[in-house]
Amino acid sequence: MALALVLASACKNGNESFVSGNLEIYEDFPSRFVESRAVRVWTPSDYDSSQKYDVIYMHDGQNLFDASITWNQQEWGVDEVISSLIESGSIRPCIVVGIDNSELRYAEYYPSAICDDVPAGVLPEGFRSWGDEYLRFVVEEVKPWVDGKYSTWADAEHTFIMGSSCGGLISSYAFCRYPEVFGGAACLSTHSSLMNPDTEIDQKPASEAYIEYLKENLPADADHVLYMDRGDCQIDGEYAESQAAINEMIAALDWDGNYMYRFFPGQSHSENDWRSRLDIPVRFLLGK
């Protein structure tokens, strides 16, 4: 009840001139696990509370809908892309929950479970992953609130998680950590090299620990699906070796149609490029 009152007073509508559909922004969403931040909930223009909707949880929420507020004046165009796919009948109707990042973005999107397996001296001195706490925020606080306020299918079959770069990293981790919550994950330009902005030390041992974690924990069954991709420009070019290792590992699982990987020559590490191919993972997760 207290949470509902706080969020009701903090809710505002998104800039309608930039948004296709409906966008509600809940400023300073409180948490016991991480610092508060904005949570942005997008619903289709014909949202009907008497119907049930799939839900996609996305990271870096401030970069999803409105280029006028982003650091580089680029956006994913989530509202336009998904509106078009719904209207064409290509996907099931869905809601998108965009969760803003914080100043601890790298730490919050870092898979906590691999830290003990990374050799001493590889991670920067004093580094602490907040990945587990961030996912508890998503799973234990944001999701129950969304399922209570909006008309959603709450089961894993209809719940997905998506992000790019480090957001792709934490999406793949969430997919493994909470297979009972997320039936699918989409990881664009996944930061599989685990290159750390605070050190020049080679992070290959950390990348190998991450891949081993995926190998041991991927929910490789018929009820779960995983999408990954990369370009080859800018930092995306540095993912070639680690992403190839992931593809090889997943191929050995004989996962058939549950895994989709796409390579986009000439594309870089930017919202404009992720927007240009967003329809592919969304169709894979939500296609009829």
Please report, for each region that a protein language model flagged, where it lies by residue.
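Intrinsic-disorder/low-complexity peptide segments enriched for small residues
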Residues: 3-5, 21
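Non-catalytic cap/lid and distal C-terminal segments of serine-dependent acyl enzymes
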Residues: 13-288
